[in-house]
Every structure is written in C-alpha cells, then in structure tokens.
C-alpha cells in the first residue's frame, strides 16, 4: 500500500558504489562548517538566516551555489554531480546545525533568566530532538541557463538551471515520510521510514505481508527448542497491517508543468513542456502564466502509460524498461518577472546603462526618436506609431483604498483597409516588447485566449492551463484578424481587458488568474474596405462593450493621394533594393533612431523605475477637455439623428489619463504636465474621436468640396422631384443633378444614403432604382 501515486515508481535494481558512513560523516561535517563559517563582509549569512528561520518556524535554508564554489569546490562538485545522494546529507547537516543553534539560544536565554542551565539544557535537547523536522535545502544559482529543448542524457541526475512559463499547477497532495503501522489482530505496532527523495512521487511502500510479532516469537521459540509447538504460535493472517494516520508524518507535494518561453521557440517548432515536482516550502509558489527560473535535478521515471505498459499488451516488460519519461525535481524557484529569463537580460542594468538612459530621457526629441524607431520599414502612420509607444510604456497602475485596482495598461485597436501594414506593426510590437504573445483571431478560441481546464491522463485530476492572455502577463498580446473571431470567443476577453483578471469556474475549479496585459488588435471592416458612404456602425462589426475597452481606435484608410503614393512607392523600392538598411543605420548613428535591443531595455527601465502621477493643473485640464469632448459627440449625434457606435464614456477619460502618464513615463518624469495632456488629447482626437465622428453626412470632405449644406439642398431637390409612391432610376438622377454640375457625385451618394437611413426612400435592384416611401 502506498500514499503516493501508484502509476509511478522506482526501484534500486542495481546498487552502485555508494559512499560509506565515514565519507558521509565527512560530507556532513563539511556542510556544517560551511553553514557556520561562511561569511560575506563579516556577516555570517547562513547562520543568521537559519536562526531567523527557526524563530518564524520556517524550516528551510536558501543557499547560493556560487558561495559553495568559493568555500569548498569539492563539495560543490559533489553536489552538482550527485545531487540525489548529497542533498539529503546537506539537509541533515542543516538540521543538526539548527538544533545546535536552538539549544545555544535557549541556554543563553535561560542564563539570562537565572534558571538552572543543566535542567533547562536537558529539557531543551529532548524537546528539540522531537519537535524540529528535517530542514529543506533551497538552492539558488547564477549558472548559465539551459534551453528546455537542449536537455539530453548528459544532464540526467545533474543539477540544471532553466527558465520558462508555468502553464499548469496541480492541487497539493500529501506524501508520507514516516508511517506508523499496527497489526489489526494482535495490535503489534511498528514504523517505516520512507526515503523518497529520488522519485517523482516517492518509492512505493510495501507493508509487511505477515505480522512481525509472529515472526519474532517463532524465532525465539526456535532458539529455545528444536521442536516448535504449533499451538503457541500466533496466526494473524496475511497482510494484517493497517496504517495509523494520526501517528504518521507527511509532507506537501505539488506537480507543475513548465513550457518554453514563446520568444525562444524556433520558427515552425511547437513549444515543449516538462513535468516538474516540488515539495514542502516550494509548493504554492507560482500560478499558471508565471515566468520562472528553476534550479532542479533533471531525472527520469517510468510512466505507466509509456511503451510496454499493459495497455499496449505485455505488462511491464518490453521496451518500457528502457524508455523513461523526464521530469525536474525542483530545488529552487524564482517566480518574479524581473528574474525570469527574458527579463533577466534587460533588468540587470549597469551604471553606464542607467546613465545613458537618464541622458536619453532628457533629450527633447525623445518622443520623435522612439516614434521613428517603431517599425522604420513602414512609411507614415506617425500617430499610430506614437500610440504604440504609449502602449509599450503603459500608464501607472493604482490600488484604491477600498482595494479596487485601476489598470495602467493601454489597449489599441487598428481598424482599416487591407495592405495598410497593420499586421506588420503587430509583428514589430511582438519583437520589441520584453513579453509578448502573437495570435490570430481565426485560430484563437475563448479557452486559448484565457484559460482551459485539462485532465491529467495519469491521475485523472483536473488542472488549469493558461492561455495567451495569461502567458503574456506583464506584457502585450497582439491579436491579428480580430474581426474574424467568433462573438462568444471575443466576449471571453472582456474581463481580461478591463479588470485584468480571468475568472475560472469549471470542473470544480474556481479561481482567478492575473492577466495584466496590453492588447494590440488589428481588424478589417465588414466589407473588407472602409466605406465612406456608410456610418462607423455599419463598417465596424464590434459591440459597444468591446469598443469601450480600447483606449485608442484608429481607422486606417488607403486613400488615393498621388504625392503620398509616390513617397510610399519610393520607400518600398528602397527596402527591396537594400537602401533602406543603409539609411536606417545612418539614422541610428545620427541619433534619430535607436536599435530594437536598446529600445527594449529602455522600455523595461521606464516601466520598472517610473510611475507618474497627474499634476493638479494637468488634472483640471483633462477634466474640462473631457466635458468638451462629450459635448462635441452629443452635437454630432443630434445632427446624424443616431447614437455613435463608438462610445465615449468615463472609460475614455481614464484612457486619456493613461496616455498622459505613458508620455510622462517615457521621459522618466514623476509628474505628468499639461504638455503631456495636450499630446494625449491630440492622440485621442486623432484616433477614437476621429473614428466616432466619421459620419457619412455630417463630416466634411475637403478633397471634393462636399459640405453638409450641399447634401441638405440635394435632399430638398430630390423630395420635390420624387413624390411619395413614385420611383426613378439612379442614372436618371445622375443625369439631372450631377452631369449638369448642379451637385457633386459624392453629394448624391451621401444624400441617398441619409434618406434611406431615415426611411424616406428605398433602394431597390442593388441601388439602381429609387422608390419614395415616406416623408
């Protein structure tokens, strides 16, 4: 019988050369000396750490492996090469030192209180021997990280350091370390100590098949007489022992699944994952979506579902003996974003880098430099690039006194014609953001974006597996083809975009995952291209609920402009002939652009070091401008006699605040000034307000000279020309009004569109026939 998962086991079939007791004693002595004697700058860090942990009843010790190299390279080499044998000895040494420290501390305390030190010492010794458990060794290391896909047979049973994303965590399970068993017939009790360090779930425990008291009595009787008396023997039957749970000892154990970081997965490859196990004080340290750095032992175990198992026919024989499944026995885990691999390269700032970033922040043209550095291969779209700079910087997160959180991340939607470089901008953001996940709307489901509940094939237990919004926690999610998503899948990210959490209540699992990400989405209008003769509501196939969660909405049009077309054509030709690279290198040398790596480091530095707040003058200016924006939207809605499909609510005021804070953050300014507010309002006017006010009737078209008054005059002429119940053809109206130069072609189309919306006319036969149906 076993308290561990029965599917996985290990058995020492071939005993190798094991160190004798003298060697073990020497190793334990070396570790004890290291704990007691190692110091940095006259401070005994491990002795003090152990004393503090004992006071708070934290029975663990965190050791930096680099300190072992400087103290004793031999024990460091033994620990690295034979961790499964050496770590239990290290933990024994820690426990012995802890007992010694506790005894000395209590004796000193007793002397200070004038008590009998001998009696106190004896009582304390016996108490500590029974109360202090075995301490856990937790390792930290600065060794080079090994990519997940580079782990091979050479690393088996060695300590490795690797990084990745936690995609699933199991519930805590209990693992027995000491079993107290009792015979159900004669009440004989005994105990079993379980050494389960080497296995993923501990060695399978087999209880004695017969009563040990019966065996002992038979042995003693055989010594007294050669002839045994059958009547005096006990017969407790087979398998008589039961486990006494109250007297047994257990430790916590948890299973994790680690996946490669998306940025490090080679093109065309699937991200790989690896099972991990941790126990005691390393459990419940991370949640799905956390980026971690792991120090652990790369080991293998025999899986029941592997080759040669009973399901494939043949019991446990065949190839199942040779083929093992790898796993990591965790010895140390760092779960902060700043210590994960992708941030590790950008958060270790040297003094020279910090000085360089401070000088860069004082550059009055920094805003333009960062804008020019965003996708330099794409011509134009300056406002969109500025919005992306704000998205990468982000605003300031706030926690209110009542515990409510206000997001600081900025969401941007690019909506427009094909061929306007929307996808290229998304790809560039994925490259320049320290943490980014790129996905396409058609290939993304609600579970793939948020989180899904999976069933472990071995244990049949349910566990959570994080989606794109969870894996990109602390970064950016780029969603291309946003309009191709199903409505029910798009609704799933509402909570993630505003509250920045994902609530799960599936299969008995109820939890909340963090999703502190910015969303950069790209979409096409309903008809493929944006139709100027239709309102934004007819062009945009999104609900108001999702649109209100975007801080900036850009409508990107492919307008026909000869001068602009010439500039774009020359830019594209330079890219294909290689001249653009030379120009970009020259601009980087001149300081008008910065490299991707430098920009990534500067963005990370700004996000870590700066959290601006609004000045009183900036806050007052924001408030008055928001009232003006709302009033302007109301006037537009009254003129068009319909509500805008792009809402301007209090969320948009918070959006302008976040944009203002991001503009101050890129300058490392702790206070957002009025000039930041002016630029934030200009960006908001150029994006969301421009999209909301794009009415086919009320707007002005400077290229054709069409105005609202011309459209109104045409409506009056058409009502006089066409009585109720009459019809005419589109070509007839064009000959009468356009060919005679009385009205423009655009005025004709807009007027017909407006009259149809007001149900004054009906367009039949694909718009070729106009029927007057109302007033």
Swiss-Prot record:
Record domain MCM: where: 366-573
GO-annotated cellular components: chromosome, telomeric region; CMG complex; cytoplasm; DNA replication preinitiation complex; MCM complex; nuclear pre-replicative complex; nuclear replication fork; nucleoplasm
Keywords: ATP-binding, Cell cycle, DNA replication, DNA-binding, Helicase, Hydrolase, Nucleotide-binding, Nucleus
Enzyme class: hydrolase
Entry's Gene Ontology molecular function annotations: ATP binding; ATP hydrolysis activity; chromatin binding; DNA replication origin binding; helicase activity
Stored Pfam families: MCM (PF00493), MCM5_C (PF21933), MCM_lid (PF17855), MCM_N (PF14551), MCM_OB (PF17207)
Protein name in UniProt: Minichromosome maintenance protein 5
Gene behind this protein: MCM5
């Amino acid at each position: 019988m076993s308290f561990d998962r029965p599917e996985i086991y290990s058995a020492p079939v071939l005993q190798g050369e094991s160190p004798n007791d003298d060697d073990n004693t020497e190793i334990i002595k070396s570790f004890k000396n290291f704990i007691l004697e190692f110091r940095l700058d006259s401070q005994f860090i491990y002795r003090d750490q152990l004393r503090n942990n004992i006071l708070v009843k934290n029975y663990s010790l965190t050791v930096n492996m680099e300190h072992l190299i400087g103290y004793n390279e031999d024990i460091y080499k033994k620990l690295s090469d034979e961790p499964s044998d050496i770590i239990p000895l290290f933990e024994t040494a820690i426990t012995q030192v802890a007992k010694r420290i506790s005894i000395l501390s209590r004796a000193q305390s007793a002397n200070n209180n004038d008590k009998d030190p001998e009696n106190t010492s004896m009582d304390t010794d016996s108490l500590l021997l029974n109360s202090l458990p075995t301490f856990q060794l937790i390792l930290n290391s600065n060794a080079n990280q090994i990519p997940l896909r580079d782990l091979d047979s050479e690393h088996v049973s060695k300590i490795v350091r690797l990084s990745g994303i936690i995609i699933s965590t199991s519930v805590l399970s209990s693992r027995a370390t000491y079993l107290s068993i009792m015979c159900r017939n004669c009440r004989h009790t005994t105990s079993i100590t379980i050494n389960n360090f080497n296995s993923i779930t501990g060695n399978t425990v087999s209880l004695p098949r017969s009563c040990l008291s019966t065996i002992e009595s038979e042995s003693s009787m055989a010594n007294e007489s050669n002839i045994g008396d059958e009547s005096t023997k006990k017969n407790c039957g087979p398998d008589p022992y039961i486990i006494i749970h109250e007297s047994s000892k257990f430790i916590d154990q948890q299973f994790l699944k680690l996946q490669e970081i998306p940025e490090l997965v080679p093109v065309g490859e699937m991200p790989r994952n690896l099972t991990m196990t941790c126990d005691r004080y390393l459990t419940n340290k991370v949640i799905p979506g956390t980026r971690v750095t792991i120090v652990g032992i790369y080991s293998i175990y025999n899986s029941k579902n592997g080759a040669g198992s009973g399901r494939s026919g043949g019991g446990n024989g065949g190839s199942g003996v040779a083929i093992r499944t790898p796993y990591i026995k965790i010895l140390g885990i760092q779960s902060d974003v700043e210590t994960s691999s992708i941030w590790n390269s950008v958060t270790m700032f040297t003094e020279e880098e910090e000085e360089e970033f401070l000088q860069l922040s004082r550059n009055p043209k920094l805003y333009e430099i960062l804008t020019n550095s965003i996708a330099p291969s794409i011509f134009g779209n300056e406002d969109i690039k500025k919005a992306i700079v704000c998205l990468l910087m982000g605003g300031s997160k706030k926690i209110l006194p009542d515990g409510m959180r206000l997001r600081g991340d900025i969401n941007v939607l690019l909506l427009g014609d094909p061929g306007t470089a929307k996808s290229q901008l998304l790809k560039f953001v994925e490259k320049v953001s320290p943490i980014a996940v790129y996905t396409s709307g058609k290939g993304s489901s609600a579970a793939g974006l948020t989180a899904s509940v999976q069933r472990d094939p071995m244990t049949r237990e349910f566990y959570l597996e994080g989606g794109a919004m969870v894996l990109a926690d602390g970064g950016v999610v780029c969603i291309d083809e946003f309009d191709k998503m199903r409505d029910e899948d798009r609704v799933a990210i509402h909570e993630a975009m505003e509250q920045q959490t994902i609530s799960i209540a599936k299969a008995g699992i109820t939890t909340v995952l963090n999703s502190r990400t910015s969303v950069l989405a790209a979409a096409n209008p309903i008809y493929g291209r944006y139709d100027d003769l239709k309102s934004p509501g007819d062009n945009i196939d999104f609900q108001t609920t999702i649109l209100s969660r975007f801080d900036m909405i850009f409508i990107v049009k492919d307008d026909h402009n000869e001068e602009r077309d010439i500039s774009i054509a020359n830019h594209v030709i330079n890219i294909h002939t290689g001249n653009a690279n030379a120009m970009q290198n020259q601009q980087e040398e001149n300081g008008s652009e910065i490299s991707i790596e430098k920009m990534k480091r500067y963005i990370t530095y700004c996000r870590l070091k700066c959290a601006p707040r609004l000045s009183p003058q900036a806050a007052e200016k924001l408030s008055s401008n928001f009232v003006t924006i709302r009033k302007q939207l109301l006037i537009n809605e009254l003129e068009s006699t319909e509500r805008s499909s792009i809402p301007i609510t209090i969320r948009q005021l918070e959006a302008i605040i976040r944009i203002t804070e991001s503009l101050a953050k890129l300058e490392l300014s702790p206070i957002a000034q009025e000039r930041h507010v002016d630029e934030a309002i200009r960006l908001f006017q150029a994006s969301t307000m421009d999209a909301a006010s794009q009415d086919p009737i009320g707007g002005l078209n400077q290229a054709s000279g069409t105005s609202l008054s011309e459209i109104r005059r045409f409506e009056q002429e058409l009502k006089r020309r066409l009585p109720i119940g009459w019809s005419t053809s589109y070509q007839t109206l064009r000959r009468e009004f356009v060919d005679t130069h009385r009205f423009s072609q655009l005025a004709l189309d807009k007027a017909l569109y407006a009259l149809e919306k007001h149900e004054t006319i009906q367009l039949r036969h694909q718009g070729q026939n106009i029927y007057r149906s109302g007033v």
